[in-house]
């Protein structure tokens, strides 16, 4: 039997001691005191940061929001049904972030940027913080490029520019989402990346929007971020920031992006739920004191980048639902004060058949004609003036029995102008088609037609101009101006089409 000598034993021990490395790993842990309603209270976690991600024993992730003297209030990113009192929690040392890449285009994801469309994982090599600071003053430039929505009423009278924040506000079922989705459809071929964020919506509504995008070929440049009504409040609260992080990724790569939040009032409700459960003091309408900051830090991330940063842009279109037209409620007034203008949708107009139901009188864009091409400025000024005069006259005419000829003519013109603003859903018009439509109306070419004939006449006129006078569209596209040559072509087309139309109607 082999025996070990004493010196061999000492050599082995010495080698082992030399190989030993001291590695101290300090893990910041805590214990669950209480859990329920999407909130957990944790004892310990002494060095946790505000907003840091924490991981529970069974894998659920949470965010530390309340740092109190004897416990930490954590909001859960899942249902947390498996979390038990006394189970351990560890701090991760990370703030919430998501992977980002071009591969997200055409996909439907949740607030954690995980795919929910059943088409497999999304490859990504980079990541971005969900909440990153908004661009500073020096990093921005003023808005000057138009972002066409394809809707005549908006592009002519309430123009939106790239980098602007324009609120879409109105009662339920007035076509708010339709205005936003039409804007996305109109970005086809414009090299604009679109992000649609659905917060607390019905799953069927989101599915309908996604189907529309797929049918119209808009998904190839669109990302849909969805947290439906059955999602935990934490995820509904995070969804808009996830969408903004994805849009920022493209903006800082010198691309133009557009983001729709549908709708921030649902996010505010989710945040109110979280805050009340965390026992934060309630304020007006039981919202917490920092609900303004909730939306301002989100919407301030939309910007037009300076030339040093590559002139990318992020245009934000938040949608807010009002109750019985009350825009003086807390969330609507907050968002109105943060944004650069608002588009009011009226239930009365919607029910009377004027769709999109935009109330032009009280809608406003604070960027104004800086976000219009010259050709649109040339025709839109007259339209806005005539519609304003018509609205005034119409109210007066209800009480007057006998009107003079000039007033009757002005009322007839106004009715036809209002008719030309009507558009079907998912049928956006190009700038050239909009200019032609407005020019026809404001110059009295529709006055001889019956109101019921206006829509049919305009559809045929657009087709006729496209087929027989393609130079018109070329001039508008290249010069962005309604030149004399373009005006001559337009007048010829209107005259020829009017003659054809009258003959058709007679036969």
Swiss-Prot record:
Ligand binding (ATP): 170-177
Record has Translocase as a keyword: yes
Keywords assigned by UniProt? ATP synthesis, ATP-binding, CF(1), Chloroplast, Hydrogen ion transport, Ion transport, Membrane, Nucleotide-binding, Plastid, Thylakoid, Translocase, Transport
> Which pairs of Cys residues are joined through disulfide bonds in the record?
none
The question of whether Nucleotide-binding is a record keyword is answered with yes
Q: Name one GO cellular component term.
A: proton-transporting ATP synthase complex
Q: What is the reaction catalyzed?
A: ATP + H2O + 4 H(+)(in) = ADP + phosphate + 5 H(+)(out)
- InterPro entries under this entry? ATP_synth_asu-like_sf (IPR023366), ATP_synth_asu_C (IPR000793), ATP_synth_asu_C_sf (IPR038376), ATP_synth_F1_a_nt-bd_dom (IPR033732), ATP_synth_F1_asu (IPR005294), ATPase_a/bsu_AS (IPR020003), ATPase_F1/V1/A1_a/bsu_N (IPR004100), ATPase_F1/V1/A1_a/bsu_N_sf (IPR036121)
What kind of membrane protein is this, topologically?
Peripheral membrane protein
Superkingdom of the source species:
Eukaryota
Picking any one GO molecular function of the record gives: ADP binding
* EC class name: translocase
The EC designation for this entry is: 7.1.2.2
Name the residues annotated as site: Required for activity: 363
**What Pfam families is this protein classified in?**
ATP-synt_ab, ATP-synt_ab_C, ATP-synt_ab_N
- Protein role: Produces ATP from ADP in the presence of a proton gradient across the membrane. The alpha chain is a regulatory subunit.
Q: Which PANTHER family match?
A: ATP SYNTHASE SUBUNIT ALPHA, MITOCHONDRIAL
Q: Tell me the protein family, please.
A: Belongs to the ATPase alpha/beta chains family.
Its quaternary structure?
F-type ATPases have 2 components, CF(1) - the catalytic core - and CF(0) - the membrane proton channel. CF(1) has five subunits: alpha(3), beta(3), gamma(1), delta(1), epsilon(1). CF(0) has four main subunits: a, b, b' and c.
In its UniProt entry, what is this protein called? ATP synthase subunit alpha, chloroplastic
Task: Give the source species.
Answer: Nandina domestica
Its taxonomic path starts at: Eukaryota, Viridiplantae, Streptophyta, Embryophyta, Tracheophyta
Q: Gene encoding this chain? A: atpA
